[in-house]
Amino acid sequence: MVRRKLRLLVILAGIWLVGIVVYLFKGDDQSEFEKRVIDKGPDGFYVHKEEKEHQPFQEENKAEVLHQVEDQWKKKQDAEITQSRQTFIETKKLLPPDDELGDIPWGQFDELGYISKTTLKPGQDPYARNKFNLQASDNIKSNRHVPDTRHMNCRSETWSQDLPDTSVIITFHNEARSALLRTIVSIFRKSPDHLIREIILVDDFSDDPSDGQELDKIKKVKVLRNDKRQGLIRSRVNGANMAKGKVLTFLDSHCECNEKWLEPLLDRVKQDRRNVVSPIIDVISMDNFDYIGASADLKGGFDWNLVFKWDYMSAEERNRQRQNPTAPIRTPMIAGGLFSIDKSWFDELGQYDLKMDVWGGENLEISFRVWQCHGNLEIIPCSRVGHVFRKQHPYTFPGGSGQIFARNTKRAAEVWMDEYIQFYFAAVPSAKHVDVGDISERLALRDRLQCKPFKWFLENVYPELKIPSVQDIAFGSIKQGNDCMDTMGHFADGILGLYPCHNSGGNQEFSLTKAGEVKHLDLCVTLVDTRPGNEVKLYQCTPGNYKQQFVQNPAKDQLRHKSYDLCLDSVVWQTKGIVANKCDPSSYTQKWTFSLSKNR
């Protein structure tokens, strides 16, 4: 009799435990619900998380546990368990496949253990590996607070409640663990959970595979490791091909997302799937990792050397932006590292040019392609993402970064620039001899998409880019033997010097206008004193300023001031910079030739 009572007590205790489990399954907290499921073994009523598919409950097991319970109680318990099972199955349908994603919430990831494996040893150079201060990065937690740099109007802005989800794609090679983890954590912290379908980390064959493998444990994080070095371009395509989100969001591996960065991007893509949108890119100091808000008055552009640069918006554009600070900003080019694009539109547009190598020029190519093939490029002011800007690349390029950039850039130019490619060659003469390989597939893509000519792009998207053939007498680099006139990195009130010609434009790109201005960007070579032997300087171009007016004498290869018998001279450039001396046709240091001149 006692044995029978004990047996009944054990059974009732078991039923009580089952009731608690059923109660817990009815909770509304999905993450807690998932955690409880994980904690159950595979031999009970619930399937273990590691199983790929949910398996039906085994009626035999249930009956074995409950076979001595009164029929009425058994029926009630069966009904509750069946209801819980159905809830579980429906919830599982909404979750990503368990075999593809980790099961550790980002807040429970062992940050210290992950970062400590690459901690600097005493005496090690903190800049050596990543070209930013690794010690400073490692000392900052992954969930640190950064200032909200958005315009105040953004804080009251509302976005669609039915936004598409996104796959965030991050490629990396030997990235600092602390910087990579901080990027991931900022995405989770600053984004609505339901909008992040997954974060895809593409490890471009880092020296230590565990850099990415250990992050694979985090929920919603997938890691794809290349079996050899493929570079950013192909790595991004690899990530995009496995993405399941409706929108692709590309980020660099050393970023920090700001408040509500994602919603305005997705909202704009939802409004028009052909909108390709980028956040305002704030600056994270490479030295101390301070987070600094960037100007909202900038848009992406380029010179005829096809190197990306930031342009200030025109006065008209700035006035419009003042009236509506949250309005999208049309941009001729995106920086390339951070943007969102509808996945189907990305595929339809031809993804990236896979015959480009490693890195460089891909932002130029996709910007041309989006605009010329009926899309839009925009910067979204209410979206802010910080980025660590470095002075040099932390890794080597097979073949050399300069050669790869030249090849990639020329591929883009050959496909998209039509007859205007001549001005690229004038600015970068060395590009004429670069072999770009077969571009027939990209030309066929352009035909298939019925894309617009580059002339349309210049007239409708980037009218600020001056067309040399119309406005200039001469253009490109100003040569003196193997050396070229160079700004030496100076801006307004800066002197000029000589530097070996690198044929890459930039500091060596000038033009001679019909008005006689020797221009570099919006700066003009200016006579500061009419006495011989005084340096010339770069000052803001002012229409009609006689001190900024020179004439070219092709017969004598001189650049002579329009009103004075003074010619640009490099005789003392190492001590005073370029000076204006009395013109001397026999002087070698006064001989200058433009790489492209209408007078020749």
UniProtKB/Swiss-Prot annotation:
O-glycosylated. Its cofactor is Mn(2+). PROSITE patterns: RICIN_B_LECTIN. No change in activity by storage for 72 hours in a range from -20 degrees Celsius to room temperature. Dramatic reduction in activity by storing above room temperature. Less than 10% of activity after 72 hours at 37 degrees Celsius. It catalyses: L-seryl-[protein] + UDP-N-acetyl-alpha-D-galactosamine = a 3-O-[N-acetyl-alpha-D-galactosaminyl]-L-seryl-[protein] + UDP + H(+); L-threonyl-[protein] + UDP-N-acetyl-alpha-D-galactosamine = a 3-O-[N-acetyl-alpha-D-galactosaminyl]-L-threonyl-[protein] + UDP + H(+). It is found in: Golgi apparatus membrane. Pathway: Protein modification; protein glycosylation. Residues 328-390 are annotated as: Catalytic subdomain B. Pfam families: Glycos_transf_2, Ricin_B_lectin. Optimum pH is 6.0-6.5. Residues 163-268 are annotated as: Catalytic subdomain A. Substrate binds at residues 171, 204, 229, 253, 359, 390, 393, 395. One of its GO terms (cellular component) is Golgi membrane. Residues 29-600 are lumenal. Keywords: Disulfide bond, Glycoprotein, Glycosyltransferase, Golgi apparatus, Lectin, Manganese, Membrane, Metal-binding, Signal-anchor, Transferase, Transmembrane, Transmembrane helix. Its EC number is 2.4.1.41. Mn(2+) binds at residues 252, 254, 387. Its main location: Golgi. There are two conserved domains in the glycosyltransferase region: the N-terminal domain (domain A, also called GT1 motif), which is probably involved in manganese coordination and substrate binding and the C-terminal domain (domain B, also called Gal/GalNAc-T motif), which is probably involved in catalytic reaction and UDP-Gal binding. The ricin B-type lectin domain binds to GalNAc and contributes to the glycopeptide specificity. Catalyzes the initial reaction in O-linked oligosaccharide biosynthesis, the transfer of an N-acetyl-D-galactosamine residue to a serine or threonine residue on the protein receptor. Has a broad substrate specificity. Acceptor peptides include Muc2, Muc5Ac, Muc1a and Muc1a', with Muc2 as the best acceptor. Acts on non-glycosylated and mono- or multi-glycosylated peptide substrates. Transfers preferably to threonine rather than serine residue. Belongs to the glycosyltransferase 2 family. GalNAc-T subfamily. This is Polypeptide N-acetylgalactosaminyltransferase.
